[in-house]
Amino acid sequence: MKNNKKLRTWLDDFNLSHPLVIAGPCSAETEKQVLTIAHELKDTDVSIFRAGIWKPRTRPGMFEGVGAIGLKWLKKVKEETGLMTTTEVANANHVKLAIENDVDVLWIGARSTVSPFIVQEIADALEGTDKIVLLKNPVNPDLSLWYGGIERLYSSNIKKLGVIHRGFSSYSKSKYRNNPEWQIPIAVSYTHLTLPTTRHV
């Protein structure tokens, strides 16, 4: 994949004098919660409202998100606040439902990035759309997986791309929940110099 300035034009189109800010609840739990937070954020520097609709959990029986009903809440956020919206997608059906509900930005989570099959399924489902797609780093510090995900999306003619640095899981004791391993996002930015990179907090 060649270094391509078109990959970041979507970010330039925001015409911001500050970094792009994406904020919102980790999980959408109720319509009231989502709308209350969105209204509190609308007059800040936040440009995109985020909320997890589907939550990938390690074990069954844990809260796995409210599901598709939450997309209706995101639609209300757009209507009432004017904020753009984003949520995580992990398969082709998620993509279909998000597009049907006019979600502006789709992100692929760290657990999905580790699977070329999942990334390819999502890339195929997004082909021909004009959505902004953000790809989190894989759970493990594997640069090739991150590159591969970017390349799969780009090969499906998805040109509004960005990456999210969330840090990496580690078996060793650390003061961080996720180790930054800064050399990896730096390597990605050097290889794809015009690809927007965001930091997950």
Language-model features: locations:
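Glycine-rich, proline-tolerant flexible connector loops at the mouths of alpha/beta enzymes
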Residues: 50-68
